[in-house]
Design a protein with these regions (language model features):
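An N-terminal hydrophobic leader/cap segment in hydrolases
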Residues: 4, 14-70
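The serine-hydrolase catalytic nucleophile loop
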Residues: 98-111
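Conserved alpha/beta-hydrolase
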Residues: 111-131
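Alpha/beta-hydrolase active-site loop
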Residues: 135-156
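Hydrolase active-site cap/lid region
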Residues: 178-235, 244-245
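Short beta-strand/loop motif that positions the catalytic acidic residue
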Residues: 248-250, 255-257, 261
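Acidic catalytic loop of the alpha/beta-hydrolase fold
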Residues: 260-264, 292-293
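Catalytic histidine-centered segment of alpha/beta-hydrolase-like enzymes
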Residues: 289-299
């Protein structure tokens, strides 16, 4: 009987090692697929990432300054700096969405310029003129934003910096604001941010397949995927979740979202707002607006809400 239990124990150990090995192999494949997946097709987003003809033309015609920084991993990141006509020490960094580039942020400039802000338009890595093959969902983007903030502060040591992001850019802004680097920001505007990219992927899988077995497989794979991510990046998936970042935020934040957003449900914005620890937080929902187009569908309302938030923030300083 003693030998039987010993053999049973050894069989159990062998099976556990085999399952773990297979799981890690599949988890590593899932990690690689996560980065190389055609997210434009999965999420139904048109890919305009590398079309920078408009921003280049505007740079030439308006004498805007093309700028660049080096990311910590050596990749070159590019942007456009637009100095306010006033002698201003405040700047907003405008951050575009997935498969877009800094051209997307042009409609957001006017209100900031009216309020006296310098403007820095940036291309996230893997977008526009910045190097990289694709987004890294926050693994490198937080450090990239630090490089841009340091560039601004080297240019003007008195500079105060705010972030305004749209969709993916909003989520990156929240990740930065919740990091150790982001505590000195003057404000964050998060327009149509997602809370958890893994959960968003799970929801899209359910919508596409409609089979609970796919979700079971997704959930079964999750711990191995997380282990593979930690092996490759030394970061946990939770570090890429704006839903966790807002729990560490101290800076003023304005959450914006469309009530008819079918990509990132409006409940996400409400959850981010509810869990945000900032002593000054606001939320505004644009009725009838789809994903990340509030500035088009509700332009005057968008500008009014933004201006009121920024002016209140300035008064509180």
């Amino acid at each position: 009987m003693k030998h039987f239990f010993k053999r049973l124990f050894l069989i159990f150990i062998c099976l556990a090692v085999l399952v773990a090995g297979v799981g890690m192999y599949i988890g590593n494949m899932a990690y690689e697929e996560f980065y190389d997946a055609p997210w434009d097709q999965i999420l139904g987003i048109e890919n305009h990432s590398r079309d920078v003809s408009t921003i280049r033309q505007w740079e030439r015609e308006r004498d805007w300054e093309p700028v660049r920084v080096n990311a910590p991993d050596g990749k070159i990141l590019r942007g456009t700096y637009i100095e306010n006509r006033r002698d201003s020490h405040k700047t907003v960094i405008l951050i575009h969405g997935l498969y877009q580039n800094r051209t997307m942020c042009l409609p957001y400039m006017d209100e900031y310029r009216r309020l006296g802000y310098n403007i820095l338009l940036i291309d996230l890595r893997g977008h526009g003129e910045s190097e990289g093959d694709h987004t890294e969902w926050g693994i490198s983007e937080v450090d990239d934003l630090l490089m841009w903030c340091q560039w601004l502060q080297n240019r003007d040591p008195q500079m105060t910096i705010g972030l305004h992001g749209i969709s993916l850019g909003a989520s990156m802004a929240l990740l930065y604001a919740g990091s150790e680097y982001g505590q000195d920001l003057s404000f964050v505007v998060a327009d149509s941010a997602y809370g958890n990219i893994i959960s968003l992927g799970r929801e899209k899988l359910w919508q596409a397949v409609g089979d609970k077995r796919a979700i079971w497989g997704y959930n079964l794979l999750d711990p191995f995927f997380q282990a593979a991510m930690f092996y490759h990046t030394h970061k946990m998936v939770s570090s890429l979740e704006p839903a966790q970042a807002v729990k560490r935020m101290k800076v003023p934040v304005l959450f914006l979202h469309g009530s008819e957003d079918e990509l990132v449900p409006v409940k996400t914005a409400r959850s981010l707002y509810d869990n945000c620890t900032s002593p000054k937080k606001e939320i505004h929902i644009f009725e009838g607006s789809p994903h990340a187009v509030g500035i088009e569908t509700n332009q005057s309302e968008y500008m009014r809400v933004l201006s009121q938030f920024l002016e209140e923030d300035a008064d509180s300083v």
